[in-house]
C-alpha cells in the first residue's frame, strides 16, 4: 500500500522527489534495536531469576545509555554498552559491580557483544536497495565500525558512505555529527537542499538534524506500540520537533519516493 500522498510535500518547499541523498540512522530505523536490547537483557536476567518487563528494560536503557555517551563521547560503543549494563544491573537487581563484580562483567560483555545479533526490520533490505536506485544512501550511526559491520551483514547493502560515532568522535544528538554528515554530502556533490535525513529517533536525529537545516523524514516504527504503552522506548524524550515527512515504515517511504 502506498503512503498517503499529502505526506510527499511535507512542511517545506522541498519536495521529496528533490532528494538526491538520503542519510539514515541505523538502530531503531533499519535494525530493530528495541527487540535486540530486550531479548538480550531477558536472556541475561532469566538465569538470575529476574523477569524485567520490556518497558522497564527500555526505559532504563534510555536513561543510562545517553548519560554514558554524553560523559564519554570518545568511548567505542561496546565500552558504552558495558558501562550502561553496569548501571542497568543495579536498577534491575542483577549482579552489579558492588554485589557480584565478576558475573556483572561477564553479563556486560554479553550485552556489549550483542549488537550484531539484533535483527533488521523485515522491510529494510529491499527498501534500501530500491531507494539506492534513485539516491545516494549514507549511514550516520551511533556505534563503532565493527558493530555496524555486523549489522550491515544483516542489511546486505553497500552504502555510499558510512559515518560512525567511532570515526566522528561523538554521539548523536551532538550536532557535530550532523556537521560531519553535511560535509560528507557536499564532498559527494550533494547540497543540503537535496538531502533528507531519515530516522526513527526524534531525540537522537530529528532535533539535531533540523537544527543544522536538514529536512527530515520520520520512520515512526513504534508509533502504535508507543501510544498503547505510554512509553518512549529506548530513547529519551525529545525537545518539540515536527518532522517534514512521516511514514510508518521504510517500505512506505520507498513506495512514496519511487512513485514520483
Question: Where are the regions a protein language model picked out?
Answer:
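Alpha-helical structural context
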Residues: 47-48, 91-92, 134, 154, ...
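Asp-based, Mg2+/Mn2+-dependent phosphohydrolase catalytic module
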Residues: 2-22, 34, 125, 129, ...
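Residue-level detector of secondary-structure transition/capping positions
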Residues: 45, 65, 132, 185-186
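Glycine-rich active-site/cofactor-binding loop and its immediate structural neighborhood
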Residues: 112-114, 127-132
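N-terminal helical cap/lid subdomain that shapes the substrate entry/recognition surface
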Residues: 15-122
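A general structural signal for well-ordered secondary-structure junctions
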Residues: 67, 134-137
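Short alpha-helical linear motifs
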Residues: 80-85, 131-133, 223
Amino acid at each position: 500500500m502506498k503512503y498517503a500522498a499529502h505526506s510527499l510535500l511535507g512542511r517545506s518547499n522541498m519536495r521529496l522527489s528533490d532528494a538526491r541523498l538520503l542519510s539514515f540512522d541505523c538502530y531503531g530505523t533499519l535494525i530493530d534495536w528495541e527487540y535486540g536490547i530486550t531479548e538480550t537483557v531477558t536472556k541475561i536476567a532469566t538465569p538470575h531469576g529476574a523477569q524485567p518487563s520490556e518497558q522497564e528494560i527500555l526505559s532504563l536503557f534510555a536513561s543510562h545509555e545517553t548519560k554514558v555517551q554524553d560523559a564519554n563521547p570518545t568511548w567505542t560503543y561496546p565500552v558504552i554498552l558495558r558501562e550502561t549494563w553496569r548501571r542497568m544491573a543495579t536498577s534491575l537487581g542483577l549482579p552489579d559491580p558492588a554485589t557480584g563484580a565478576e558475573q556483572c562483567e561477564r553479563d556486560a560483555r554479553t550485552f556489549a557483544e550483542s549488537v550484531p545479533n539484533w535483527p533488521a526490520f523485515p522491510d529494510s533490505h529491499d527498501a534500501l536497495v530500491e531507494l539506492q536506485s534513485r539516491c545516494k544512501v549514507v549511514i550516520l550511526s551511533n556505534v563503532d565500525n565493527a558493530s555496524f559491520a555486523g549489522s550491515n551483514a544483516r542489511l546486505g547493502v553497500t552504502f555510499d558512505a558510512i559515518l560512525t560515532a567511532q570515526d566522528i568522535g561523538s554521539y548523536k544528538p551532538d550536532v557535530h555529527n550532523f556537521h560531519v554528515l553535511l560535509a560528507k554530502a557536499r564532498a559527494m556533490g550533494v547540497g543540503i537542499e537535496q538531502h533528507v535525513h531519515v530516522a526513527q529517533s526524534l531525540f537522537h536525529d530529528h532535533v539535531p538534524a533540523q537544527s543544522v537545516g536538514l529536512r527530515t523524514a520520520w520512520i515512526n516504527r513504534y508509533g502504535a506500540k508507543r501510544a498503547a504503552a505510554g512509553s518512549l522506548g529506548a530513547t529519551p524524550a525529545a525537545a518539540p520537533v515536527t518532522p517534514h515527512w512521516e511514514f510508518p515504515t521504510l517500505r512506505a517511504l520507498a513506495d512514496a519516493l519511487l512513485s514520483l
